[in-house]
A protein has these predicted regions:
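Primarily recognizes the serine-hydrolase "nucleophile elbow" in alpha/beta-hydrolase
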Residues: 127-201
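C-terminal catalytic histidine-bearing segment of alpha/beta-hydrolase fold enzymes
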Residues: 227-275
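Short beta-strand/loop motif that positions the catalytic acidic residue
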Residues: 206-208
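N-terminal cap/lid segment of alpha/beta-hydrolase-fold proteins
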Residues: 1-55
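Alpha/beta-hydrolase active-site loop
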Residues: 108-147, 257-260
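Short beta-strand element of the alpha/beta-hydrolase
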Residues: 57-66
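Conserved alpha/beta-hydrolase "acid-adjacent" motif
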Residues: 213-219
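Short amphipathic alpha-helix adjacent to the substrate-entry channel of hydrolases
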Residues: 75-93
Length: 275
């Protein structure tokens, strides 16, 4: 199945965000591993991938790729996720959220930044409120235009991977009435912006691999927090998979994680039978 034609939607109205000093051009780039990514997002967008109307369920998922806040791994944590969701009647909206700006030394600088916790903290801490705002605005925008896209306004969720998991989990902790996700799925998530579990916290689907020390710690911590708050939560931990597997097929049980997600959606009434 090919992805249908898709619409790129600016996340914010003109002039709503301050881009002063954000001078690096957004572009496709490659990591030293050969991974194709997007870097230097200054103007956040949502890209709409809508399922065939004959199988559309009315459910929507905002998909947030990861990339250490320096880039977006937009294929195996973005468009490939959207393709699978569309095949199962689910509308997908890939979020390009704001990133650390990088220059001519990309991708070498990514490794240097990741090797220094102090340097990473200095770079990403100022970014956190911006990406949280992007996550909340994504939910708000999809809900505002739900009728246009054939989406049920009470079945709009958010999913993210690694840094995109941070966007997802932060959104699930720090929303207002217009930006509350109906469900959230942080996949091997980085630590979120804090805050107590809200009184009306959405159902949470957490997933990671045990051989991913960072994400397994975050996942178990927020499983406990949701449980202690009496909110619906499910946690899957695969013994192997590492960090960043996304839709890559590794010959491991983690290859089928997205099927577990769909089962969870059905169990909670977010995914009715397809037409």
């Amino acid at each position: 199945m090919n992805l249908p034609s898709h619409q790129v939607i600016p996340l914010w109205p003109d002039g709503a965000i301050d881009t002063t000093g954000w001078n690096q051009p957004e572009e496709i780039a490659y990591l030293e591993s050969g991974l194709k990514v997007i870097r230097n997002v200054v103007h956040p967008t949502l890209t709409a991938y809508l399922p065939d109307p004959s199988i559309a369920t009315g459910t929507a998922v905002i998909v947030c790729p990861g990339g250490a806040y320096h880039f977006l791994a937009f294929e195996h944590e973005g468009t490939e996720v959207a393709r699978w969701l569309n095949e199962h009647g689910i509308a997908a909206f890939m979020l390009k959220y704001r990133l650390v700006q990088t220059g001519e030394d990309f991708p070498q600088c990514v490794g240097e930044h990741l090797s220094s916790r102090q340097k990473m903290k200095k770079l990403v801490d100022p970014l956190f409120p911006l990406v949280l705002a992007d996550g909340c605005q994504a939910v708000r925008l999809v809900r505002t235009r739900a009728a246009e896209w054939g989406i049920a306004p009470d079945r709009i969720g958010i999913m993210g991977f690694s840094a995109g998991g941070m966007v997802t989990l932060s959104t699930a902790l720090n929303y207002d009435a217009s930006s509350r996700p109906d469900f959230a799925a942080p996949i091997y998530s980085a630590p979120p912006m804090g805050g107590p579990v809200p009184a009306d916290a959405p159902p949470l689907f957490l997933l990671c691999a045990a051989d991913d020390d960072m994400a397994s710690g975050v996942s178990t911590t927020y499983y406990k927090k949701w449980r202690e708050a009496g909110k619906p939560v499910e946690l899957h931990i695969y013994s192997k998979g590492g960090h960043g597997f996304g839709m890559n097929q590794l010959g491991l049980p983690s290859d089928h994680w997205i099927e577990r997600f769909a089962e969870w959606l059905k169990a909670h009434g977010f995914l009715p039978e397809s037409k």
